[in-house]
Amino acid sequence: MQVGKILLPLLILGNAFMALSANDGRDAKFIPASDSRIAYMGRISTAKPDTVRFTYPGVNINAGFTGTSLKMGVKPGSGSYMIEIDDELPYRLNIGPNDSIVTLAESLPEGNHKVRATYVLEGYALKPEFHGFYVDKGADLSAKPVLPKRKIEFIGNSITCGYGVEADKPTDRFTYD
């Protein structure tokens, strides 16, 4: 009888742990940030192997992919992105202190899809990194997206990138939250 009182909670905890860890990218195919089918726009650094680093808002990561879901490997606690899947309305994705693999899309119909992840914070203190994408087993990235030939570069400071645009009042101080 005592064994049952101990085993049941252990089984419940074990199942809970397995459910939590099931979404960590282990059942997916990893494609590193250095893959030539990923297109970047903005100032990036590729000095660290298989990693793309950046600090400026507006840097975006573009790719086409097949399958029904997509995850992204990032540096934990590195800020926020606006995510666009298949030209649908973008949504904001905040990278928490424990997030290293984040879900961008799931339950998509089978077929070809595209993603754009745009960094939306000043990343100087956060030092964001992109490590790569996770696609479904049997899925892959498509050909590298064609970026616009003409671009406009904005050179400025915090005001240029929208410092305080999400503040409730003019006296609010900047935070990464």
Where are the regions a protein language model picked out?
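N-terminal secretory targeting modules
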Residues: 20-155, 160-176
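Bacterial Sec-dependent N-terminal signal peptides
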Residues: 1-27
